[in-house]
Amino acid sequence: MKNPVNQDTLRIPSGYPEPRDILRKHFPIIKDELCIRGGWGYDQEDAVIVYSFDEEINPKQHFDGISLEKVFINYRIREETEFAHETKYTGVNWERTGHQLVHGDNGILYDRETVEVTMFTPEAWDFLKNDWESHNGYKDDDKGKLHHEALREERIIRFTEVFWFNVMNILP
């Protein structure tokens, strides 16, 4: 089951609330850090606009753009996999695989981030968890552990996501 998910089906649906509002609602821990406006960042036209300062969010603190981008990447992926669709995923992780500064035709400087996302269906996660626990974590069983890793690799879902950030408001 290499990749039963078309990553386009994970995109935030049209008509969904703006990221600034919905992410602050679903993830209150970041409500005082999310100095963004704009879209979900799927392309230049939908870029996330990053601010180092936002009086409405937190008038006492300035943020660096890179940290805000990482926060946004993490929580957009969580929004896509936990809230925006009927199907939920678990064991979701991501790793940055690329970064590029792009000068748009409109004169705007964009930060284009590429990440690899890995996740599991709940059924695959439960299967792997039960296998691991029923074999006591394969303690002292290297062959069994290798077999478990093969089972994990068969069930993992991998895909690449791109994030576009308008960084004009964080330039010195």
Task: Map each language-model feature to its residues.
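Cysteine-centric segments in proteins
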Residues: 2-110, 116-172
